[in-house]
Amino acid sequence: MIVAAGTKNPNKIKAVKDAYRLFGFPAEVVPVGRPAGTPPQPVGLEEVVKGAVARAKAALEAVPGAEHGVGVEAGAVHAGGAHLDITVAAIADRGGAVTLGFGPAFQIPTAFLPDVLKGVELGELAERYFKKPSVGYREGIIGVLTGRRVTRYQLNLAAVAMALVPRLPKNAKLYRT
């Protein structure tokens, strides 16, 4: 199965490949860059979901032989009086169906919050503060905050795995529309 991933980030590409493998789908993942017009740091759940869906659909269109397009997007959401960074995955197929999955969310450091809410990428802020270049392509800010006990790859993997749940053959009847 050919899967187009709307990213060039090795973390996200590995998460897509491993999530498909987890459920027994042998996937050849073809990376495609982020579509134009997608903000680097979406704010609000609708914007994060919209970004993941846009990535998935654009990736699917960019790779003619792909069965699925996958978009993974992280962004800031407000819930329970806190601002959280959440990862959302969207999987689009040639029939027009889109399935969604969310990964674990963590509270955004208050020191970074004003800039994040203005649209500055959380990874960029972490790189500057922690003096770690390309942190988003490695462990992510969550990896820095947790001493690598939890990494960005794990958040991405969880989100893609959850987006695959409705696509599992054993669940076909449950999710039929």
UniProtKB/Swiss-Prot annotation:
Catalytic reaction list: XTP + H2O = XDP + phosphate + H(+); ITP + H2O = IDP + phosphate + H(+)
Biological process (GO), any one: nucleotide metabolic process
Pfam families: NTPase_I-T
Cofactor(s) required for function per UniProt: Mg(2+); Mn(2+)
EC number: 3.6.1.73
Keyword 4Fe-4S: no
Membrane-spanning segments: none
Cofactor: record remark: Binds 1 divalent metal cation per subunit; can use either Mg(2+) or Mn(2+).
GO-annotated molecular function: ITPase activity; metal ion binding; nucleotide binding; ribonucleoside triphosphate phosphatase activity
The organism's place on the tree of life at top rank: Archaea
Top EC class of this enzyme: hydrolase
Key words of the record: Hydrolase, Magnesium, Manganese, Metal-binding, Nucleotide metabolism, Nucleotide-binding
Family to which the UniProt record says this protein belongs: Belongs to the YjjX NTPase family.
Function comment: Phosphatase that hydrolyzes non-canonical purine nucleotides such as XTP and ITP to their respective diphosphate derivatives. Probably excludes non-canonical purines from DNA/RNA precursor pool, thus preventing their incorporation into DNA/RNA and avoiding chromosomal lesions.
Subunit structure: Homodimer.
Protein name stated in the entry: Probable inosine/xanthosine triphosphatase
